[in-house]
């Protein structure tokens, strides 16, 4: 929790922030945040890439930071409540094996399969690939985990374990 409480930072990476169980992500961010600024000047950036554990296994802390990072909700000084901006990318955007030779994500199934950077033809789009995976899962708990680990939306990323309806 108490890391980086005095050193000025230009960059802070909190990898897999949605999986912290032993420490408080919110408390850690409260301590680290001032190290990225000096007065009103921002000198450093924070990056918190993560998939999300169950809410009771560290996910709730990241969800709180996510909710406090909404650019539509700012304080009187113009900052989000967390000082961060949230950013979400669906699993199917930029997924390995679905990038064409020009660096573009092949999300929708193409009429004419493009060549992937690895050399194979991309015959199905990445979104359809993940929809096919989901369609093959009949166990609701497994489907819930699949959606949380490979989310199409932030709502899926922060799914609670009780949200097990397959409809």
Where are these regions (language model features)?
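Walker B catalytic acidic pair
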Residues: 13-19
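Conserved P-loop NTPase catalytic core
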Residues: 1, 7-12, 25-26, 50-167
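Short strand->helix junction
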Residues: 2, 19-20
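Proline-rich low-complexity regions
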Residues: 16, 34-35, 90
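Structural recognition of the conserved hydrophobic beta-strand(s) that form the central parallel beta-sheet
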Residues: 42-51
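Short, conserved "post-DEAD/DEAH" coupling segment immediately C-terminal to helicase motif II
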Residues: 23-42
């Amino acid at each position: 929790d108490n890391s980086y409480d005095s050193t000025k930072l230009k960059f802070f990476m909190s990898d897999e922030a949605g999986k912290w169980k032993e420490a408080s992500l919110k408390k850690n961010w409260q301590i680290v945040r001032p190290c990225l600024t000096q007065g009103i000047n921002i000198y450093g950036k924070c990056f918190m890439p993560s998939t999300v554990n169950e809410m009771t296994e560290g996910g709730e802390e990241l969800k709180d930071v996510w909710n406090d990072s909404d650019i539509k909700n700012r304080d009187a000084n113009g900052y989000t409540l967390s000082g961060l901006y949230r950013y979400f990318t669906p699993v199917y955007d930029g997924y390995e094996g679905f990038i064409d030779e020009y660096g573009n994500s092949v999300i929708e199934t193409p009429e004419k399969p493009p060549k992937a950077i690895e050399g194979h033809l991309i015959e199905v789009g990445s979104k359809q690939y993940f929809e096919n995976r989901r369609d093959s899962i009949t166990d609701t708990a497994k489907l819930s985990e699949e959606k949380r680990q490979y989310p199409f939306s932030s709502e899926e990323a922060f799914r609670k374990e009780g949200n097990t309806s397959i409809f």
